[in-house]
Amino acid sequence: MTKPYPRAFSHIGLSVRDIDRSYKFYTEVLGFYTIMPPTEVEQDDSAIGIMCDRVFGPGWGRFKIAHLSTADKVGIELFEFPDNYPPENNLEYRKLGIFHFCIQDPDIEGLAEKIVAAGGKQRMPVSEYYPGEKPYRMVYCEDPDGNILELYSHSYELTYSPGAYQHQLDE
């Protein structure tokens, strides 16, 4: 058996209510690059139509999609399906599957303000992981559709590096 190796994270797909509003939010507020602006895909015999039949099953009809990219080349796909709807609880953390994704920015306070000004929501106060010891901060927010995004002030590796919780173990 071949030893496993770390794979790169390629992209995430987000279902949104209004693709034009979400496209503007993710490009203008979060600064993501446009790979493909909002485009309509219809069920037909094209390669993409057949591929979508395999993913969504028969009768999906049509949807709109946009492809974006982050600074570290992770793709963000925005999907607007007809008759889509928000979940009753957008933070179903006990439900299996993805319940949030995280964006890194050194000024999470400023970015959270921009998110709120653009129709999103700040779910909690900015919090410090190691008050008085390390400057690592985080906050949970929502995009205008209620998709949960976390903001980190520092990289995941720095925040959770070996010894990150050592001060708690020594007490």
Residue ranges of model-derived segments:
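Vicinal oxygen chelate
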Residues: 1-5, 14, 37, 76, ...
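Short, structured motif recognition centered on aromatic/hydrophobic residues
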Residues: 9, 73-78, 98, 149
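A cross-kingdom feature marking solvent-exposed beta-strand/loop segments within repeated
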Residues: 47-51, 86-87, 130-131
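Short beta-strand-to-loop junctions in surface cap/lid or active-site-entrance loops
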Residues: 79-85
